[in-house]
Amino acid sequence: MPARTAPARVPALASPAGSLPDHVRRRLKDLERDGLTEKECVREKLNLLHEFLQTEIKSQLCDLETKLHKEELSEEGYLAKVKSLLNKDLSLENGTHTLTQKANGCPANGSRPTWRAEMADSNRSPRSRPKPRGPRRSKSDSDTLSVETSPSSVATRRTTRQTTITAHFTKGPTKRKPKEESEEGNSAESAAEERDQDKKRRVVDTESGAAAAVEKLEEVTAGTQLGPEEPCEQEDDNRSLRRHTRELSLRRKSKEDPDREARPETHLDEDEDGKKDKRSSRPRSQPRDPAAKRRPKEAEPEQVAPETPEDRDEDEREEKRRKTTRKKLESHTVPVQSRSERKAAQSKSVIPKINSPKCPECGQHLDDPNLKYQQHPEDAVDEPQMLTSEKLSIYDSTSTWFDTYEDSPMHRFTSFSVYCSRGHLCPVDTGLIEKNVELYFSGCAKAIHDENPSMEGGINGKNLGPINQWWLSGFDGGEKVLIGFSTAFAEYILMEPSKEYEPIFGLMQEKIYISKIVVEFLQNNPDAVYEDLINKIETTVPPSTINVNRFTEDSLLRHAQFVVSQVESYDEAKDDDETPIFLSPCMRALIHLAGVSLGQRRATRRVMGATKEKDKAPTKATTTKLVYQIFDTFFSEQIEKYDKEDKENAMKRRRCGVCEVCQQPECGKCKACKDMVKFGGTGRSKQACLKRRCPNLAVKEADDDEEADDDVSEMPSPKKLHQGKKKKQNKDRISWLGQPMKIEENRTYYQKVSIDEEMLEVGDCVSVIPDDSSKPLYLARVTALWEDKNGQMMFHAHWFCAGTDTVLGATSDPLELFLVGECENMQLSYIHSKVKVIYKAPSENWAMEGGTDPETTLPGAEDGKTYFFQLWYNQEYARFESPPKTQPTEDNKHKFCLSCIRLAELRQKEMPKVLEQIEEVDGRVYCSSITKNGVVYRLGDSVYLPPEAFTFNIKVASPVKRPKKDPVNETLYPEHYRKYSDYIKGSNLDAPEPYRIGRIKEIHCGKKKGKVNEADIKLRLYKFYRPENTHRSYNGSYHTDINMLYWSDEEAVVNFSDVQGRCTVEYGEDLLESIQDYSQGGPDRFYFLEAYNSKTKNFEDPPNHARSPGNKGKGKGKGKGKGKHQVSEPKEPEAAIKLPKLRTLDVFSGCGGLSEGFHQAGISETLWAIEMWDPAAQAFRLNNPGTTVFTEDCNVLLKLVMAGEVTNSLGQRLPQKGDVEMLCGGPPCQGFSGMNRFNSRTYSKFKNSLVVSFLSYCDYYRPRFFLLENVRNFVSYRRSMVLKLTLRCLVRMGYQCTFGVLQAGQYGVAQTRRRAIILAAAPGEKLPLFPEPLHVFAPRACQLSVVVDDKKFVSNITRLSSGPFRTITVRDTMSDLPEIQNGASNSEIPYNGEPLSWFQRQLRGSHYQPILRDHICKDMSPLVAARMRHIPLFPGSDWRDLPNIQVRLGDGVIAHKLQYTFHDVKNGYSSTGALRGVCSCAEGKACDPESRQFSTLIPWCLPHTGNRHNHWAGLYGRLEWDGFFSTTVTNPEPMGKQGRVLHPEQHRVVSVRECARSQGFPDSYRFFGNILDRHRQVGNAVPPPLAKAIGLEIKLCLLSSARESASAAVKAKEEAATKD
């Protein structure tokens, strides 16, 4: 059958547009009987008549619509004006605008050749049988096709009595009006013929079925293809008559043909019979089929009346004349609109276009030219007969046919086509089978072992099916995906499609191969993020069998619904105890981004042959006995508890109640159903049916678990034990033993007391009765016993803290206690009994005991009154430290309390104190030195102050002040309205100012009651200006050093309580070393070279008193300082203490960011590193050539070491016990980061996780220092259970430990990156503090507290609102890098300029580095590149600023405008009244898959789901020069999690070097592999500046320990000398 041409849209003309087609007239008549209101009737009729109206009328109708929408016109007025307009301009009464066409012998719109009826007859499946004709009913797409329709009754002609548009427009019955003009060539014969045709048409009108449906299709096609024509002349009538004669001849022969049968197996065999017939019977306005001229003669059917040469010549001349006439008419009419322009015009008008009819079975448009299935293969047989063929048999006479009766044979199938029961080619992946639509297929079946895709050796089959299931297989890493059909008789593996089915199957193959990529990727990367998935998609080469050059992100989004469905199907084939891979982070991101609908029926689609091995990714964890004991013995008890809680809550959280999965009944077959009472089970498990587990709720729970606790509410601090009502003491029960030790302050102290005949003395431990009897007994150490003046018998309790009251919670050892800084005076009557608490000191050989069998029992613990402790616990900071070594003296041994002493020291340290007084004048005391928090401040010292402490004379504008918003053209920028918030992620708009800095000129305070009032100390100081505080504003600070200041003689008086710390400010010319060496010599160092005069706004030479800090201020001129000023306290220079570098093992090292920071801090020498990923391991080797890098599994290496091996299989030397002094690393949380509950299913994975392996490394090697780095959510995973167990293991080993969250942006990088850090120090070492922030940063990104079990924990950091230095910006980071284009791949290029900022100078280094490496960026697809080009270059711009225009891409493809065809109930209409919705879900309905749009400049998926995801703010966003990077990820994608990855001024994503700089890597640092490998190395790394800051804190601990050791050695030497 020749391909039919698509209906052509023609412009409306001022000349007559032709009469109405028959189907329109019939529909108009039906409307009168539908009982519609006047408004509905008008709307429906306008819908039908719209394309037949003239251009001028359409324009006026659109104006009326606009006025109606803007409420400038009432609804009644609108209807009246529409009627008036049409009656005035389109009425027949004026005789000028007739819409009818003269009956000149031209073929009618409704005419239809005989072959179409026969085609409809024969195109049915065997299941479709003739049905009895029923009474006439309104035509619809769902009418059943008629089988036996007379060919002569099908061909109809248009009557000369045509109904006008206005006659149909008015509501009410309409009568036909006879035509007044005489028709040319109207003879008695033609009139009789017309009467016959009318009669036949009336017969056809009463029929329902195939003939009516096909006739309706042809009438639509003919009506839409009808173009403007000149009045036909007499010769046109003659040609038409001759053509009609040929048609009648063909019909007679067709009617007489006895071989024609209305069966699907024969309906295509006679297809060629109608080819010539179709060409000869086409309407005059229909273009000639060009393929007809090229057909060979043997293809023409013999029964067709031959066309004479004269007829062909006349036809060709007629065609030429019609083309010429059309060109003349088009030159005077409105130009033809493009498809996108027509859609845009229609979106503004309420009047929709006429919907083309659809097939009631497959739902496809009947005017699709490629709709029909052509023909069956030769000698095709039915399925049962085909299956009995010997060609398909693989068994011999001795073989068993089936193993069981339930088994089905499996064959291969090639040259196949799939079609519905009406013969329309159908895809199988659009949900038709799931909707129970019967699909059949034909082709050639072959034996299962035959892999030749040709039809040779096979047997042809027809009408196989219907298809019960279609399935996929081959997710095993191979090249091919197997696609199969299942019928009631057999299963078929598809090979190659037929030629006609190839385009449909090609689209299906693309989405299937993408699904294969996704499933196989997630098998080994269950924790991959969206950017990782895009990386995999874009780097996979498509197979040659599909017509696709490359896979892109747009390909994934286009097929997202299908891909997610396949992943869900894959999960259904897995075991119940396996985590669904569709809950992985990348799949959840895809679901949200593409707006995928979950929970749809998948019963007819399955995944076969899943070959993924269980727990394939990590090997079984190698654990030490201590770690194994904690995880496998104790924690299993907690698992049972959480399992019980999960089961109780399972039914509540398993349903959303909306999706199809939730609404379907229980299957009755799964494990959960079989346990239900209704299916005969016990009902104990209380689990939902496995088939009804809601995917929407699972995704929501997984999303909730990943959300960080940014806004941590204020939690109550841990309650201290307060004594309740005083108990009435029983003197008989309590009595003092012995004489009083001391009488002091109305208290008589004793050493011993008897309680219930049990002796208790100072230093013993007791259990105390709580006020609430439901709580367990409190435990305390008795530090004092006394009786007050009122006879109350009291004791002082230093409380122990149970493990359950610490951050460890339920994971703690029930026998382990912790000392805390809390104590209280209590009545002796509260004591319950005496208990035994043993101090468990670390053994002398502690470091070498790693990996051995730990002690599991505590002697005497069976009595229930024996406990042990080994650490002090700080409840506010969650720090476990070694207990203080303070010993009692003779003066305080009767009341020695560690808690009291510690609290007294803290209070004494925090209180301001005057150290040296100079003089007193008028009641004011002038001082030379004061102290606070252990820091001494002297005259001439420089101090930090909060930004509000004083102001400057120069008013500086904000560096990121936004310009006023101009009005936006919403037609061009339809998504701009979503930018209602001024907040821009990555902006420093709300970043605080850094500390003010001043030099102390004068210290004074008042007197109170004759004493110095130390609570009211004032400082007079000189102000230092930062560059941004001068008139040069922030532009002046960009090029200067970040620690450069300007001297000023301006003074300010501040409170000493406002001082935040001390710093060093030196005049640059007075330094004995370079400014760079001085700045890097220690923390808090500044310099100045000039003074700033704010009055003249000039920079001057500093005065002498600024250059000579030794000349102290005079205290209002009344005295002079004594001696030379000392900038800092006298202390031993650091250079005098030689600190050997710690021998370090870096596990999960990546490219080496953590080690690089420790190297910069000067504390570490990384001798060993473990990294399985080869590109990262190679990068580590490039930057650390002296390091032994292992590329093996860490579990394998630890197993070798524990077995006593010295080298690995490659001969590399393994570190032995005692070699490793520092262990650092960031173990991936692979396999257990998806959900926030521990249960028996996920527990087994956690036991084998890399966190457990890393802790086993720590236990075996027992390093001096241990650091674990991970994502911020590490502290929140699984009810914080991962954090608790990690700390529990460290405590059990004997380590001091703590945890905290740090923001990398506060340590000198232009990036927000919060990281969880766990620090541990061996017994005898000092546990490091977390480093204080160095730079100010956006407060929104600095929420660093953590809530565990409803308790809020913070770190020791005190700089919460400001910092010493300003924030580092994107401009500081990369403004000096040369410009490159999208896809730049040159790994080495010149800098082409000097560094412009302090940060750039630091990263370039002092060495000569003429080559810039890794300044390369990803080559984005043409569509993404076009979007990037259209993102504006102003701050905060993103996808919402894209114009809605049509663009030609770099590959020549056209990117279309996005069409808005739905009302968005949430966002309303635009200012122009345009719609804002792109899917039916915007109206509150279910999503319509047919609403999807692709290859548009504005990505369709973003406005589709924007209302639910904060309008996708930041996607396709540009970085801001004065802002910062979002967390650098492993693959910069414009639509990825990071969001703003576009260069501020260039149309590309950020380069590898720019990302590396955002992490703080120096330019000399090398990366390895392709561009995506390098991006991944950078994104996974720890920012070296953050690691350096932590390393410097470890260095302070080492220095402190070294000083104490040196002091102890000196003291011991002196004592030895004294003895001698």
Curated annotation (Swiss-Prot):
Region (Interaction with DNMT3A): 1-145
Binding site for S-adenosyl-L-methionine: S1149, G1153, L1154, E1171, M1172, D1193, C1194, V1582
Biological processes, Gene Ontology terms: cellular response to amino acid stimulus; cellular response to bisphenol A; chromosomal DNA methylation maintenance following DNA replication; DNA methylation-dependent constitutive heterochromatin formation; DNA-templated transcription; epigenetic programming of gene expression; methylation; negative regulation of DNA-templated transcription
Zn finger (CXXC-type) start-end: 649-695
EC annotation from Swiss-Prot or TrEMBL: 2.1.1.37
Pfam families according to UniProt: BAH, DMAP_binding, DNA_methylase, DNMT1-RFD, zf-CXXC
GO cellular component, one term: pericentric heterochromatin
Residue ranges, annotated region (Disordered): 1-21, 96-369, 702-732, 1097-1136
Enzyme class (EC, first level): transferase
Segments of skewed composition (Basic residues): 126-137, 719-730, 1113-1125
Complex formation: Homodimer. Forms a stable complex with E2F1, BB1 and HDAC1. Forms a complex with DMAP1 and HDAC2, with direct interaction. Interacts with the PRC2/EED-EZH2 complex. Probably part of a corepressor complex containing ZNF304, TRIM28, SETDB1 and DNMT1. Interacts with UHRF1; promoting its recruitment to hemimethylated DNA. Interacts with USP7, promoting its deubiquitination. Interacts with BAZ2A/TIP5. Interacts with PCNA. Interacts with MBD2 and MBD3. Interacts with DNMT3A and DNMT3B. Interacts with UBC9. Interacts with HDAC1. Interacts with CSNK1D. Interacts with SIRT7.
Name of the protein in question: DNA (cytosine-5)-methyltransferase 1
Lineage: Eukaryota, Metazoa, Chordata, Craniata, Vertebrata
